[in-house]
Amino acid sequence: MTITLPNIHPTAIVEDGAKISNSCKIGPYCCIGSEVTLDNNVSLESHVVISGKTFIGSGTKIWPFSSVGSKPQDLKYSGEKTTLTIGQNNLIRECVSISTGTDGGGGVTSIGDNCLFMLGSHVGHDCKLGDNIVIANNSAIAGHVIIEDNVNIGGLVGVHQFCRIGEGSMIGAHAMVSKDIIPFSMIVGMRPVLSGVNLVGLKRRGSKKEDIKKLVDVFSRLFERKGNQNFKERLEAIDTDELYQITEVKKVIEFMKQESARSFVAPKT
């Protein structure tokens, strides 16, 4: 079915059942599936494909040749009804692909607000992304990955399935991430290592200078190899320390205490 409303180009194809706000703009040769919902002021440039049971929040803009809501790239997927939810004011640039979930991962892929997905980036099935995330050109996020708020991922990065990327962290270009990344950390290298605290990110979020200094001290204490304490003992010592009252320190400790399928990216030994 072709709809020719004022904001929908006559060459666009919108299937029966799609829910599209009157304020949306749909450009030439876009294809919108029957289970798609587009909230207010969503803008699609030309040749965008939105499929599956997909909700896209208000103010989100999608550039040409992106495929959003496509079936999961998972051999176990057998056609079950799963979903993709995208929040408000996201920028999805050219040739981006984002998949719906699978039954094995809860059935939902979710993305928060104010994220930027640069050209050629990919978000796999069952991923959970927070707000204010930047994923640079041609980076690929495998299935079941959790990315917390305010994360910046450089170009040509690959993130292995089931990894967790902590809040406020920064991953340098070309990294192959196969372990969890601690909040507020800076990760560099093709075989990535923890190079320190993401000072720029902390300043941007408005962290106090004295709190940043204490967080740097916590990182040093966690990964120093002096004395007889093992890593778990060092972590527990900080858990009972007055440093634990600092918001950023508390986030780091709680992240590291959670159960995970992966270990942590650590400094080079």
Roles of regions detected by a PLM:
Residues M1-T11, D16-G17, S23, G59, ...:
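Terminal amphipathic alpha-helical/low-complexity segments used for targeting or macromolecular assembly
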Residues I3-V193:
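Structural signal for interior beta-strand "rungs" in well-ordered beta-sheet cores
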